[in-house]
């Protein structure tokens, strides 16, 4: 790799690390190309991304970012999964590790907080931001729905009484 290409790679990685909400580091030794493509696809669908680069270049790119602490995890063949959503990358990484023994999570970072393997797994078990937003909207809409049901209930009861009276009159 030429010096200019290395500089470009470091700058690109640095931008990714500056804007990311969470980063997960894992060993991927022994994964097939098809498995790596599957991982990349799953990450992309979840709104996350996967980066494989030389550890030395990644350590340089980490300087001046919040996730600089993961530099100590970059030993051997490592992959770095990043996402803005604090749950997306850990969730996909943990699920992928369950089905692929060659994919071993080493740890990660959420902002300036260093995460060990258990912390990454705990983060993966949380609901995503979209799920939380859906629950919040449901909670906000529920009272309005109940009020609408209560306001239409008397009219519905009156209509049923009139219908019953009309049915009774026809039968007589």
Curated annotation (Swiss-Prot):
Q: Which GO terms describe its cellular component?
A: large ribosomal subunit
> What Gene3D superfamilies does the record point to?
3.30.70.1730, 6.10.250.290
Keyword Glycoprotein (UniProt): no
Q: Which domain of life is it from?
A: Bacteria
GO BP term (any one): translation
Question: One MF term from GO for this chain?
Answer: large ribosomal subunit rRNA binding
Pfam families (alphabetical)? Ribosomal_L10
May I ask which residue range the UniProt record assigns to the signal sequence? none
The record ties this protein, via PROSITE patterns, to: RIBOSOMAL_L10
**What are the UniProt keywords, alphabetically?**
Ribonucleoprotein, Ribosomal protein, RNA-binding, rRNA-binding
- Subunit (UniProt): Part of the ribosomal stalk of the 50S ribosomal subunit. The N-terminus interacts with L11 and the large rRNA to form the base of the stalk. The C-terminus forms an elongated spine to which L12 dimers bind in a sequential fashion forming a multimeric L10(L12)X complex.
What does the UniProt function comment say about this protein?
Forms part of the ribosomal stalk, playing a central role in the interaction of the ribosome with GTP-bound translation factors.
Record's family?
Belongs to the universal ribosomal protein uL10 family.
The protein's name in its UniProt record: Large ribosomal subunit protein uL10
| Source organism of this protein record | Nitrobacter hamburgensis (strain DSM 10229 / NCIMB 13809 / X14)
């Amino acid at each position: 790799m030429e010096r200019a290409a290395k500089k470009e790679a470091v700058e690109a990685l640095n931008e990714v690390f500056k804007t990311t909400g969470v980063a997960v580091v894992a060993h991927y030794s022994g994964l097939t190309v098809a498995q790596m493509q599957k991982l990349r696809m799953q990450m992309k669908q979840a709104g996350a991304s996967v980066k494989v680069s030389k550890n030395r270049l990644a350590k340089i790119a980490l300087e001046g970012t919040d996730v600089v602490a993961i530099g100590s995890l970059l030993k051997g063949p490592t992959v770095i999964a990043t996402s803005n959503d604090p749950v997306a990358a850990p969730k996909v990484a943990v699920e992928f590790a369950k089905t692929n023994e060659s994919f071993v999570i080493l740890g990660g970072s959420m902002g300036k907080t260093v995460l060990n393997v258990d912390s990454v797994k705990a983060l993966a078990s949380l609901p995503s931001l979209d799920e939380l937003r859906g629950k919040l909207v449901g909670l906000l809409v529920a009272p309005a729905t109940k009020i609408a049901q209560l306001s239409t209930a008397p009219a519905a009861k009156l209509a049923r009484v009139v219908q019953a009276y009309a049915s009774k009159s026809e039968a007589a």
